[in-house]
């Protein structure tokens, strides 16, 4: 049913509540990522395969790399370009690959390192720049895929600053600021948080450095409006900061807002994710064989508002489609993908105002004038008045009822039938 005809209180729910689907992936999911508009879900698998599912049918439609060139070890991260045409994948096979989904048979470009890749994110998709973290490296790498792939260390440019800086440990995670795309945030194995200002491939500047914990920083996320930063650490605590960057991108100010912990079970957290826009909610997956839930907190008050249940195993990666308001997470043991969605009951009275649901059949009583003949002249006059109303069937609405932009560019992925049949038969 058209979403505009649904119950507005159900449509505008800010987070899903019920497990609605389970996607069985025979190749065992390691990581996952929605396309920018939520039309597709990319799954990185344990054998190095990349499988893309259509979220309308919950069926695979594309397996990039059917003419060699696919990863040969588990995929560690996936990143979509804003238009949904390009994909970045990193893997434990020491390589990062760039895929053009209009020609998915083999990677468009790739670059290899000397150790496994922790993760990779877009820095500027238009210029084909990305940033990656490598196993047991003290600095992140900026990679340029515009021509022949080139990698450069994201290091402190000032030697005096470098000599006076204590050991930060190995770089584990990184993210790019959503409102200041030239600001790169890096987390290390010794709890340091470093902010870099990117000028060019060979020129970077460390503008702020702060030690927030003595343990590993496992995950960094920035809200869509750029005002909140959440940090998942191995000390069983998720820290939420208000982040402020000046107009010249030269100074950073962090203010601690909340700390999220499971004070009863002392659980660690596998993955964290903000909701859209102002990040009113924060969702996290729990670590441990006995923990099978996703926790959702309200970021303003720091209170737990929802626990998503239904999975029968530990959950790892998380992603949130804000168009359909669905959350997905992959299971640790089976590799299946669990989908939580907003369940909207059909509101048929929107189509027929006198519609009423009944629990059992009732005898219909005909009204006295229900089937009386209508004067043809009056009927014709009413039809003419209705025909005079102009109906625009071409102009698309810019925003849906949740405020998501409907006019963003979307790429349609061609279906790869042959590879899908081989995957399902394996």
From Swiss-Prot:
Transmembrane segments: none
Presence of keyword Cell membrane: no
Outcome (variant: residue 264 to A): Completely abolished H3K4 di- and trimethylation and greatly reduced H3K4 monomethylation
GO biological process terms, semicolon-separated: regulation of DNA-templated transcription; subtelomeric heterochromatin formation; telomere maintenance
Pfam families (UniProt xref): WD40 (PF00400)
Residues reported in the UniProt entry to bind DNA: 236, 266
This protein's GO CC annotations: chromosome, telomeric region; nucleus; Set1C/COMPASS complex
SMART domains for this protein: WD40
WD repeat copies, ranges: 24-63, 70-109, 212-251, 264-307, 310-350
Principal localisation: nucleus
Keywords: Chromosome, Nucleus, Repeat, Telomere, WD repeat
InterPro entries named in the record: RBBP5/Swd1 (IPR037850), WD40/YVTN_repeat-like_dom_sf (IPR015943), WD40_repeat_CS (IPR019775), WD40_repeat_dom_sf (IPR036322), WD40_rpt (IPR001680)
Claim: Protease is one of the keywords in the record: no
Compartment annotation: Nucleus; Chromosome, Telomere
Misc: Present with 907 molecules/cell in log phase SD medium.
Subunit field text: Component of the Set1C/COMPASS complex which consists of SET1(2), BRE2(2), SPP1(2), SDC1(1), SHG1(1), SWD1(1), SWD2(1), and SWD3(1).
Functional description taken from the UniProt entry: Component of the Set1C/COMPASS complex that specifically mono-, di- and trimethylates histone H3 to form H3K4me1/2/3, which subsequently plays a role in telomere length maintenance and transcription elongation regulation. COMPASS recognizes ubiquitinated H2B on one face of the nucleosome which stimulates the methylation of H3 on the opposing face. SWD1/CPS50 acts as an assembly and regulatory hub for COMPASS complex formation. Serves as a highly utilized surface for COMPASS interaction with the nucleosome.
Protein name in UniProt: COMPASS component SWD1
Species per Swiss-Prot/TrEMBL record: Saccharomyces cerevisiae (strain ATCC 204508 / S288c) (Baker's yeast)
């Amino acid at each position: 049913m058209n979403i505009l005809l649904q119950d507005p209180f159900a449509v505008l729910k800010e987070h899903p509540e019920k497990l609605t689907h389970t996607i069985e992936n025979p190749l065992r999911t390691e990581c996952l990522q929605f396309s920018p508009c939520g039309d597709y879900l990319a799954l990185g698998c344990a054998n190095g395969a990349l499988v893309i599912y259509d979220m309308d049918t919950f069926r695979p439609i594309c397996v990039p790399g059917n003419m060699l060139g696919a990863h040969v070890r588990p995929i560690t991260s996936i990143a979509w370009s804003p238009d949904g045409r390009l994909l970045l994948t990193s893997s434990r096979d020491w390589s990062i690959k760039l895929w053009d989904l209009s020609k998915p048979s083999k990677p468009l470009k790739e670059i290899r390192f000397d150790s496994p890749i922790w993760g990779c994110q877009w820095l500027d998709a238009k210029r084909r720049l990305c940033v990656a973290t490598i196993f047991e490296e003290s600095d992140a790498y900026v990679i340029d895929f515009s021509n022949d792939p080139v990698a450069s260390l994201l290091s402190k440019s000032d030697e005096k600053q470098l000599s006076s800086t204590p050991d930060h440990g190995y770089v584990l995670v990184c993210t790019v600021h959503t409102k200041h795309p030239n600001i790169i945030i890096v987390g290390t194995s010794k709890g340091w948080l470093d902010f870099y200002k990117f000028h060019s491939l060979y020129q970077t500047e460390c503008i702020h450095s702060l030690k927030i914990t003595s343990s590993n920083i496992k995950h960094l996320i920035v809200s869509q409006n750029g005002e909140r930063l959440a940090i998942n650490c191995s000390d069983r605590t998720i820290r939420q900061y208000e982040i402020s960057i000046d107009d010249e991108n030269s100074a950073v100010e962090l203010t601690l807002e909340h700390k999220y912990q499971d004070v009863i079970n002392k659980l660690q957290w596998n993955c964290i994710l903000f909701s859209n826009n102002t990040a009113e909610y924060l969702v996290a997956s729990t670590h441990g064989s006995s923990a099978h839930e996703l926790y959702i907190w309200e970021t303003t008050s720091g209170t737990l508002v929802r626990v998503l249940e239904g999975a029968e195993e530990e959950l790892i990666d998380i992603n949130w489609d804000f168009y359909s308001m669905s959350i997905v997470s992959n299971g640790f043991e089976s590799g299946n993908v669990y989908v939580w969605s907003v369940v909207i009951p059909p509101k048929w009275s929107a189509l027929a105002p006198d519609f009423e649901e009944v629990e059992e059949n009732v005898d219909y009583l005909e009204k006295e004038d229900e089937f009386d003949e209508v004067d043809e002249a009056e009927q014709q006059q009413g039809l003419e008045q209705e025909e005079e109303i102009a109906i625009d069937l071409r102009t698309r609405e810019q925003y849906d009822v949740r405020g998501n932009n409907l006019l963003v560019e979307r790429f349609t992925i061609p279906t790869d039938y042959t590879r899908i049949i081989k995957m399902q038969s394996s």
